A protein has these predicted regions:
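Conserved alpha-helical positions within TPR/SEL1-like repeat arrays
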Residues: 45-56, 79-90, 113-124, 147-155, ...
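Alpha-helical linker/edge segments of TPR/alpha-solenoid repeat scaffolds
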Residues: 164-167, 190-205
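Structural signature of tandem alpha-helical TPR/SEL1-like repeats
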Residues: 21-31, 57-69, 90-103, 125-137, ...
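Short coil/turn linkers that connect adjacent helices within long alpha-helical scaffolds
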Residues: 71, 105, 139, 178-181
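TPR/TPR-like (Sel1-like) alpha-helical repeat modules
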Residues: 150, 154-180, 193
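Structural marker of alpha-solenoid helical repeat scaffolds
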Residues: 36-40, 73, 107, 141, ...
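Alpha-helical segment of the N-proximal tetratricopeptide repeat
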Residues: 6-65
């Protein structure tokens, strides 16, 4: 990731908007970041944020070109490898996305997002135990990351570890900031009730 603190902060702000906010809010941050990168003549950052803007527009092939350019200028940017992989998934190039996640981990082993997103893909294709290992690594790096607990809960649920899933879902609600993500809170509340019902049925058949 960028060594410039201002761009690191903007990347974090953008990631949070994508994860917990709206596409419009994320696009606004990406445009602001691009302007700052252009003003600073930070070529790798400029390409990275151009890629983000194209991703938000749904132009994944165009985004890949910008992430490739960012990687060429800064081969140690784990986020660019990560986001290229996400674009490939959107284009249906799933198996070939894994090497980009792995390269992101190689060049930036302390970047939590790449472990999380690799785990998300593994969970979606049924490789739940491998996904859990990725989510646990993510949480080693960022222990208060609600979206990862959400995905961890889903993977545990898929393995019928209902107790573990319940604990992880409750952790999501604990970590989400008050007053935001109301729809997510509602969905998780429903899941918690479903799991509690399953656990009660197992105890009282």
């Amino acid at each position: 990731m960028s060594g410039h603190c201002v761009f690191l902060d903007l990347r974090t702000e953008l990631d949070n908007a994508i994860t917990y906010g709206t596409k419009a809010a994320a696009a606004k941050i990406a445009r602001k970041a691009l302007e700052k990168a252009q003003a600073a003549s930070a070529g790798a950052e400029e390409e990275y944020f151009r890629g983000q803007i194209e991703m938000l527009r749904g132009n994944h092939s165009a985004a890949i070109k910008h992430f490739d350019a960012a990687i060429k200028l800064n081969p140690a940017d784990g986020a660019a490898f990560n986001d290229r992989a996400l674009c490939m998934i959107e284009l249906g190039i799933i198996d070939k996305a894994f090497p980009y996640f792995d390269k992101g981990i190689e060049v930036e082993p302390d970047y939590a997002n790449v472990y999380h997103n690799k785990g998300w893909l593994l969970n979606n294709i049924g490789r739940h135990r491998e996904a859990i290992a990725c989510f646990k690594k993510t949480l080693e790096l960022e222990p208060e990351r609600p979206v990862t607990y959400d995905n961890l809960a889903d993977a545990l649920y898929n393995l019928q570890d209902y107790g573990g899933a319940l604990k992880a879902y409750k952790k999501v609600l604990e970590l989400l900031k008050p007053g935001i993500c109301r729809q997510i809170r509602k969905q998780i509340g429903i899941k918690i009730k479903q799991i509690e019902k399953k656990l009660n049925s197992a105890l009282n058949p």
